[in-house]
């Protein structure tokens, strides 16, 4: 056996008594093998004879990428988008969410998200639903935001009929048993505890900045169920909400990777004339309130000294988010605001996936590169059908909170100043790149189709959005920033807030020419 191994080793190495075998793999033989065989003299730039000519996608023929929309007799809209491949993503998007809970117990949308894909009239349990989807290689998910609830399934296109039937049952025929509600109560309670303990404060700060910006109205209502309401929400409360907001005229059945007519036929079969589990009484208690921006401050004092992701503790930080009202996604200024947000950019001290992303954005150049003690500085833009919020999140040591806030207010003031052509073009290119790369994903296309059709009854195609981005000029960015700076700020603060400036001082800084905070005088140091 040892002799065989030794022989094989020598053969592979080409040494010893087997050295002559190397001639078989020498340069002349290798060149003959790789010369092209039957096509030795045809350059790569010429087509091979007898080989079918490949057909490539062209940039023209936009009709192939148009979103088709059909409205059924009951008001439900069916939207579809072609995408090649054997899998599809189909779902139902509903115009409901936490912003519509003013007349209800806050937290209903959070409960419904956790209750999704539980037992229904046709399926006895969540396991049965998952087994049905597995036969078509499918997965399911439900997400709620402040203004939209989305039930989605990705599966083999051949199972479209089964998928739409399942979605209709999940949305319109949920059982909402006492056991399921109790299990959901525990899941919601756990998520609230996790929200308050997780090292990443961004979800909590986003909740707080909305609460400060829109005091007790529409998008300022709690997205997560308040602790005091967890025990109060039951089947009757859920049915009361569903009766008003889960109506066909507030729904869109969207699909990507499916034939439009097939999807419409499935919608007529499973979503037309269906009696929902909560009855078919008229929706009489719909909240049609328009968002009222108020500005203000939300503070949460907390010991952040023992927060860690593992054995290595994170430095004790104070987190600040300062925001101003922007505009709705239905307005023309939405695109300039999106470019402005990309121009501000920013990030953390450490970037996942390698350095280089946004390193020439303003918050990197002016903040993170110049102030080593700043742990994070990132710009965010939240936009809804009747309002919007552009904000900057910053983190630093509690002893440098005042200086950090002043740096952020200065950056807000600089937004209304001169816009360099190079940085604007870079931001526009980054925004276009991000848009197109995200839309390579089927679930993202599905969400884009569904949300646009739900909000506007049509869809702007990617090339139209790219044209709008290219047309943004420096004066457009300066105009929207100057308009934004005339409003009241919204402030969220988390951590050790001993040195946090007052709301009035922050407001004064944002109204000044240089963004400086008013000087404070102390009798005793």
From Swiss-Prot:
User: Would I find Mitochondrion among this entry's keywords?
Assistant: yes
PROSITE patterns (alphabetical): INSULINASE (PS00143)
Q: Does the keyword Mitochondrion apply?
A: yes
- Alphabetical list of Gene3D superfamilies matching this protein: Metalloenzyme, LuxS/M16 peptidase-like
Which keywords describe this protein according to UniProt?
A: Acetylation, Disease variant, Intellectual disability, Membrane, Mitochondrion, Mitochondrion inner membrane, Neurodegeneration, Transit peptide
Gene Ontology BP annotations: protein processing involved in protein targeting to mitochondrion
Residues with the modification N6-acetyllysine, per the entry, are: 299
Primary location class: mitochondrion
One cellular component (GO) term of this entry: extracellular space
* One Pfam assignment: Peptidase_M16_C
Reported effect, residue 377 to T: In SCAR2; impairs cleavage of FXN; does not impair cleavage of DLD, NFS1 and PRDX3
Query: N6-succinyllysine: which positions carry it?
Result: 64
The record's subcellular location field reads: Mitochondrion matrix; Mitochondrion inner membrane
Presequence boundaries: 1-33
Tissue localization of expression is:
Ubiquitously expressed with highest expression in fetal tissues and adult brain, cerebellum and cerebellar vermis.
Task: Cite a single GO MF annotation.
Answer: metalloendopeptidase activity
| Connected disease | Spinocerebellar ataxia, autosomal recessive, 2: A form of spinocerebellar ataxia, a clinically and genetically heterogeneous group of cerebellar disorders due to degeneration of the cerebellum with variable involvement of the brainstem and spinal cord. SCAR2 is characterized by onset of impaired motor development and ataxic gait in early childhood. Additional features often include loss of fine motor skills, dysarthria, nystagmus, cerebellar signs, and delayed cognitive development with intellectual disability.
Protein function: Substrate recognition and binding subunit of the essential mitochondrial processing protease (MPP), which cleaves the mitochondrial sequence off newly imported precursors proteins.
Q: Which family does it belong to?
A: Belongs to the peptidase M16 family.
On assembly, the entry states:
Heterodimer of PMPCA (alpha) and PMPCB (beta) subunits, forming the mitochondrial processing protease (MPP) in which PMPCA is involved in substrate recognition and binding and PMPCB is the catalytic subunit.
Please report the name of this protein according to its UniProt entry: Mitochondrial-processing peptidase subunit alpha
Q: What organism is listed for this UniProt entry?
A: Homo sapiens (Human)
Provide the organism lineage as a comma list.
Answer: Eukaryota, Metazoa, Chordata, Craniata, Vertebrata
């Amino acid at each position: 056996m040892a002799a065989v191994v030794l022989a094989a080793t020598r053969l592979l190495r080409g040494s010893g008594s087997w050295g002559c075998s190397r001639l078989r793999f020498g340069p002349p033989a290798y060149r003959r093998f790789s010369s092209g065989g039957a096509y030795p003299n045809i350059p790569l730039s010429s087509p091979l004879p007898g080989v079918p000519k490949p057909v490539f996608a062209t940039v023209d023929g936009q009709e192939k990428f148009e979103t088709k929309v059909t409205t059924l007799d009951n008001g439900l809209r069916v939207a579809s988008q072609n995408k090649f491949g054997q899998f599809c993503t189909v779902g139902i998007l509903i115009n409901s969410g936490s912003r519509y809970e003013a007349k209800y117990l806050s937290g209903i949308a959070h409960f419904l998200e956790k209750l999704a894909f539980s037992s229904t009239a046709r399926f006895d349990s969540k396991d049965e639903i998952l087994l049905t989807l597995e036969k078509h290689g499918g997965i399911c998910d439900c997400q709620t935001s402040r203004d939209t609830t989305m039930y989605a399934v990705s599966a083999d296109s051949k199972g479209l009929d089964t998928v739409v039937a399942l979605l209709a049952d999940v949305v319109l025929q949920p059982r909402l048993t006492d056991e399921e509600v109790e299990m959901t109560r525990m899941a919601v309670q756990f998520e609230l505890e996790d929200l308050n303990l997780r090292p990443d404060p961004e979800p909590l700060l986003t909740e707080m900045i909305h609460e400060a910006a829109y005091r007790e109205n529409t998008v300022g209502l709690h997205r997560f169920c308040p602790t005091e309401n967890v025990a109060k929400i039951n089947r009757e409360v859920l049915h009361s909400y569903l009766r008003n907001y889960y109506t066909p005229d507030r729904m869109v059945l969207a699909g990507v990777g499916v034939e439009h007519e097939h999807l419409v036929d499935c919608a007529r079969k499973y979503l037309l004339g269906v009696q929902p589990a909560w009855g078919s009484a008229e929706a009489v208690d719909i909240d049609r309130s328009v968002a009222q921006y108020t500005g203000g401050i939300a503070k949460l004092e907390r010991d952040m000294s023992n927060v860690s992701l593992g054995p290595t503790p994170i430095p004790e930080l104070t987190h600040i988010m300062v925001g101003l009202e922007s505009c709705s996604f239905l307005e023309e200024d939405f695109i300039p605001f999106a470019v402005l947000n990309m121009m501000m950019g920013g990030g953390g001290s450490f970037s996942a996936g390698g350095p280089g992303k946004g390193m020439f954005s303003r918050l990197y150049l002016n903040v993170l590169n110049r102030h080593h003690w700043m742990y994070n500085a990132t710009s965010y833009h939240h936009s809804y059908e009747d309002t919007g919020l552009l904000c900057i999140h910053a983190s630093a040591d509690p002893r440098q909170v005042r200086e950090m806030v002043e740096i952020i207010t200065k950056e807000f003031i600089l937004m209304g100043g001169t816009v360099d052509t190079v940085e604007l073009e870079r931001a526009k290119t980054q925004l276009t790149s991000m848009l197109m790369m995200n839309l390579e994903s089927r679930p993202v296309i599905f969400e884009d189709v569904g949300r646009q059709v739900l909000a506007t009854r049509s869809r702007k195609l990617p090339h139209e959005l790219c044209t709008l981005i290219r047309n943004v000029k420096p004066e457009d960015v300066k105009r929207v920033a100057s308009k934004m700076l005339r409003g009241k700020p919204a402030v969220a603060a988390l951590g050790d807030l001993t040195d946090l400036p007052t709301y009035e001082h922050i407001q004064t800084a944002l109204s000044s020419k240089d963004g400086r905070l008013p000087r404070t005088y102390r009798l005793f140091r």
